[in-house]
Amino acid sequence: MSRAKRIMKEIQAVKDDPAAHITLEFVSESDIHHLKGTFLGPPGTPYEGGKFVVDIEVPMEYPFKPPKMQFDTKVYHPNISSVTGAICLDILKNAWSPVITLKSALISLQALLQSPEPNDPQDAEVAQHYLRDRESFNKTAALWTRLYASETSNGQKGNVEESDLYGIDHDLIDEFESQGFEKDKIVEVLRRLGVKSLDPNDNNTANRIIEELLK
């Protein structure tokens, strides 16, 4: 089966299964190798209520080589870059098989939202947040879903503060602001160090933060 026929067959299979709430469409009718896929966030996760858009580029060697997929929708997740939408998932790399379809790949991405792999991250900062404070991580991921993936979102953060966007404790920022440091610099350093909150007795981390703020 030619690549074009396979792609058309896969699109029809998605249309024939509306209960899956997955879509697969061409970006342009003149280019059958560039598509957009969508799926819903898994229930019971911080991504519930979101609709996630994935950009799909199908290579000439498909289905013997995997499609290139990345999220158009911003997602707060250990295995998805919070900046570019790049994805760390084995079936899109070395574990790809010709029997995998675009639909099943999207279902695998949906499953990835439900079951992150923080020890094999695409976004190290987010992975550290997930491992250190799951409750705070869930709150931040849910905020991103509301801001970027909900039906009422416009893809912009609006008036949401940068600290909230990355799950950083306000009291921690206030503490360093009281020492005369600028808020933007504090948030930048805390993000770079992967610090979301701080134990009052953790003097080593506090000193490291101050050293970075003074640079």
UniProtKB/Swiss-Prot annotation:
PANTHER family linked: UBIQUITIN-CONJUGATING ENZYME E2
Protein name per its UniProtKB record: Ubiquitin-conjugating enzyme E2 1
Domain UBC core: 2-150
Pathway: Protein modification; protein ubiquitination
Additional remark text: Present with 8940 molecules/cell in log phase SD medium.
Disulfide bonds: none
InterPro entries (alphabetical): UBA-like_sf (IPR009060), UBA_C_fun (IPR015368), UBQ-conjugat_E2_core (IPR000608), UBQ-conjugating_AS (IPR023313), UBQ-conjugating_enzyme/RWD (IPR016135)
Catalytic residues (UniProt): C88 (glycyl thioester intermediate)
Function in brief: Catalyzes the covalent attachment of ubiquitin to other proteins. Functions in degradation of misfolded or regulated proteins localized in the endoplasmic reticulum (ER) lumen or membrane via the ubiquitin-proteasome system. Cognate E2 conjugating enzyme for the HRD1 ubiquitin ligase complex, which is part of the ERAD-L and ERAD-M pathways responsible for the rapid degradation of soluble lumenal and membrane proteins with misfolded lumenal domains (ERAD-L), or ER-membrane proteins with misfolded transmembrane domains (ERAD-M).
GO cellular component: cytosol; nucleus
One GO biological process term: ubiquitin-dependent protein catabolic process
Expression triggers: By heat shock and cadmium.
The keyword ATP-binding belongs to this UniProt entry's keyword annotation: yes
Top-rank lineage group of the source organism: Eukaryota
Enzyme Commission numbers on file: 2.3.2.23
Keyword terms, alphabetized: ATP-binding, Isopeptide bond, Nucleotide-binding, Stress response, Transferase, Ubl conjugation, Ubl conjugation pathway
Pfam family, one: UBA_3
Signal peptide annotation: none
GO MF term list: ATP binding; proteasome binding; ubiquitin conjugating enzyme activity; ubiquitin-protein transferase activity
Cross-link for Glycyl lysine isopeptide (Lys-Gly) (interchain with G-Cter in ubiquitin), residue positions: K93
Family label: Belongs to the ubiquitin-conjugating enzyme family.
Annotated source species: Saccharomyces cerevisiae (strain ATCC 204508 / S288c) (Baker's yeast)
Family annotation (SMART domains): UBCc (SM00212)
Catalysed reactions listed for this entry: S-ubiquitinyl-[E1 ubiquitin-activating enzyme]-L-cysteine + [E2 ubiquitin-conjugating enzyme]-L-cysteine = [E1 ubiquitin-activating enzyme]-L-cysteine + S-ubiquitinyl-[E2 ubiquitin-conjugating enzyme]-L-cysteine
